[in-house]
């Protein structure tokens, strides 16, 4: 009976059980809880919940800090109305918009638990076909760059990937795929527009507060490719655009995708989570050093912490670089490049103009990618060989990868006049009695591979000099 339902108004699980059995008999009971939910939601939506005490709001309403009990009650009511929304679609038709508004417009005002409750409620509505995938994904994507919680980001990414996967399980869903890819393009392009005031690159603590929108776009697109859900030119175009992104993490992840490391974006995400703990420790020591008594021991601890953080980042970068060299490359994606010549020229321009800005590891990755694109598509970028010449020294860090990249870029259509100076530079620097046998072997093998790909680049006098080293392996 209705009286029996009223007895459970403060016991939401029991009331929920009754309402699910006979929704029409308990409409008034649900409406009472809905109105209670609405009153608490308006407090959150008005920004009152986290305002400073004593502040005044429009409409002569005084700002009141919401208590923990009220927050807990709101979370319970939110779960309650989401569970019963299919039974009362007319009453709860505004619920999806409420959840989206709370998550996107009042994200900073919500407690971590309330954010998760809103997300779970939205997922529940989506699973019960009350909201479309388009609405669901358009709400989740902006949250990736808003939230600072690694748990929340993991939940969001899993929900996004699973939703796209299920939509394409039986057959491709071109409408949804185009919509999501459009969102991802927008996320990357916003980071490349210097006039956009919302670009994450402008924030001083961008490296400490997690990934940018563009990095999440690269990660989602890479994951879709890895799962063989998206294998089209549009996905490749998105990742190709990210290869020249001004944010170093975004660029590195996109480049590593084309080099064959399909987990690059995911690894970059985990790395940023791990790195987030390092600067936090350094920042704590800096704060203690500022406000506390200045001692030599404290300064020494701070100096050691900074050195440890730098050393760890360098080790991670070098390890990732060596792993990338072992991959055969994502040739399927490279073959799908829409305009390989323009992509190669843009990539080389980014490499040469950012010569001082890029770290050596990033430069080597770009060299590797550029050489593979040139080899696969038979491209000719003349300035590439003169640029590479300055790195052709035995003592150069990562010289083996640089030599491999140079040789790999050569093909039968490469002009001989741009290769001859490079071969001479290698011969003079690597092939002479004053260096070790390993250095001579590296130089000879590189020259041998270049000549195998383009035999006409070898000059007779240089060949006669190199004959003495023909047994170097």
Region spans (language model):
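Eukaryotic scaffolding regions of large macromolecular assemblies
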Residues: 348-361, 365-473
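Alpha-helical solenoid scaffolds in large eukaryotic transport, assembly, and signaling factors
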Residues: 1-155, 159-176, 222-226, 240-241, ...
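Residue-level detector of extended alpha-helical repeat arrays and alpha-solenoid scaffolds
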Residues: 70, 74, 115, 153, ...
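Short, flexible/disordered secondary-structure transition segments
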Residues: 132-136, 151, 167-171, 195, ...
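Short inter-helical turns and helix N-cap capping residues of alpha-solenoid HEAT/ARM repeat scaffolds
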Residues: 70, 107-111, 145-149, 191-192, ...
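Short amphipathic alpha-helical interaction elements and helix-loop-helix interfaces
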Residues: 128-131, 146, 162, 166-169, ...
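Alpha-helical repeat/alpha-solenoid scaffolds of the HEAT/ARM/MIF4G superfamily
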Residues: 166, 172-197, 212-349
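Acidic, Ser/Thr- and Gly/Pro-rich intrinsically disordered linkers and low-complexity segments
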Residues: 45-68, 191-209, 431-435
